[in-house]
Amino acid sequence: MSATTACWPAFTVLGEARGDQVDWSRLYRDTGLVKMSRKPRASSPFSNNHPSTPKRFPRQPRREKGPVKEVPGTKGSP
C-alpha cells in the first residue's frame, strides 16, 4: 500500500516539474498500464496531427507528378 501512496505524490510532482507525456509514459510503464496508455495516445489529437503531416508531404509530390502530365495535354487540346 505504501507504494501506491508514493506514486500519487510522484504524479503531481513529476507532472508539474516536467510534463504530462513524459511522466504519464514513465508512470504507465511502472504501473503496467502501457497497453492502456497506447490506446488513448492513438485517439489523442496529437497522434492525429503526426500522421496527418507526413501524409500531406507525400501527397504534394504525387499531385505534382499527376497534373504535370495532364497540364501539357489539356493545354494542347484546346
Swiss-Prot record:
Signal peptide span: 1-19
Function: May play an important role in maintaining centrosome integrity during mitosis.
GO cellular component assignments: centrosome; cytoplasm; spindle pole
Lineage summary: Eukaryota, Metazoa, Chordata, Craniata, Vertebrata
Protein name (record): Chondrosarcoma-associated gene 1 protein
GO annotation (BP), single: centrosome cycle
Subcellular location: Cytoplasm, Cytoskeleton, Microtubule organizing center, Centrosome; Cytoplasm, Cytoskeleton, Spindle pole
Tissue specificity: Expressed in chondrosarcoma, melanoma, cartilage and testis, but not in other normal tissues.
Superkingdom in the source lineage: Eukaryota
Subcellular location, principal: cytoplasm
Region (Disordered) residue spans: 35-78
Keywords assigned: Cytoplasm, Cytoskeleton, Signal
Annotated organism of origin: Homo sapiens (Human)
